[in-house]
From Swiss-Prot:
Keywords: ATP-binding, Ligase, Nucleotide-binding, Protein biosynthesis. This is Aspartyl/glutamyl-tRNA(Asn/Gln) amidotransferase subunit C. It catalyses: L-glutamyl-tRNA(Gln) + L-glutamine + ATP + H2O = L-glutaminyl-tRNA(Gln) + L-glutamate + ADP + phosphate + H(+); L-aspartyl-tRNA(Asn) + L-glutamine + ATP + H2O = L-asparaginyl-tRNA(Asn) + L-glutamate + ADP + phosphate + 2 H(+). InterPro entries: Asp/Glu-ADT_sf_sub_c, GatC. Its EC number is 6.3.5.-. One of its GO terms (molecular function) is asparaginyl-tRNA synthase (glutamine-hydrolyzing) activity. Transmembrane segments: none annotated. It comes from Geotalea uraniireducens (strain Rf4) (Geobacter uraniireducens). The keyword ATP-binding applies. NCBIfam families: gatC. GO terms for biological process: glutaminyl-tRNAGln biosynthesis via transamidation; regulation of translational fidelity; translation.
Length: 95
């Protein structure tokens, strides 16, 4: 599958990216190489191969829940530029 510069520019537009002419040319070549590799992978015979998500079998690798001491309010807020009582003070985002 060959990708065109117009397709790269369209994807950039959808991603709200502003590309220079040089970047569009570079990405066209890079994406074309990636898609050529994917085409090569699609040619492989995978009949009889069990799909896997991990190279080694894994099941629910949970750790034990343990209560540990926290760092404390003074340490947590020590480098905060602004604070209000025991909270971080941040600029208002929603009017």
């Amino acid at each position: 599958m060959k990708i065109t510069k117009a397709e790269v520019e369209h994807v950039a537009l959808l991603a709200r990216l502003e590309l220079t002419e040089q970047e569009a040319e570079t990405f066209t070549g890079q994406m074309d190489a990636i898609l050529a590799y994917v085409d090569k992978l699609n040619e492989l015979d995978t009949d009889g191969i069990v799909p896997t998500a991990h190279a080694v079998p894994m099941e629910n690798a949970f750790r034990a829940d343990e209560v540990t001491p926290s760092i404390g309010i003074e340490n947590a807020l020590g480098n905060a530029p602004k604070r209000a009582e025991s909270f971080f003070r941040v600029p208002k985002v929603i009017e």
